[in-house]
Each structure stands twice: as structure tokens, then as C-alpha cells.
Amino acid sequence: MYLGTGQQTTEALRTCISCGYSWHVVRAPAGTVVRVVASSVVPPSQAPGTVGFPYESRFVLRATGAGFTSLCLEERPPQQGAPPVARYRLRFTVAR
């Protein structure tokens, strides 16, 4: 992803919160290049009581300085010690 210094972007990843799954930052970007400034879970816009998708885990990122970095996320199941079910990697190039 290409950004200019000061620009902001939001990454939204679907997950099944009601099933116990959640996204976690496993490698944060270099803070001098990109920072995670907020994260949240947004519920579905479906009828109340609906189970499963499409909850979204949202990560707000801001470009803080020129350079290259990456963000790595994993979607983990509710079982302690279980391997991740999905991975997401985003590479950043930030210009002045």
C-alpha cells in the first residue's frame, strides 16, 4: 500500500466474533513509518440474534514518516494454543 506522510487508512477484516475468533497484531509496523492508531470490532448490520459473520475487525493506520514497513495479523480461534486460522500481511511504502 502506498501512502503519503500523514495519510490514514482503515483495514477491515471479517471474523466470527460470536464463534470466538479474533484478529491480533503479531508484528506491528515500524512506528516511525506507520502506526496503528485505533482498532475496533464492528457488529453486523443484520437482524439481532444472527450468529456468525460478518463482524469486522477494523484497524486504523496512519503514515508517520517516509520509509517501508509491514503489518502482520493473525485470526485466532478461541481454543488456547490453537494455530491461527488465517494470516494477513500488508506492506507499506510511505512517501514524504
Each model region followed by its residue ranges:
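Extracytoplasmic soluble-region selector
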Residues: 1-96
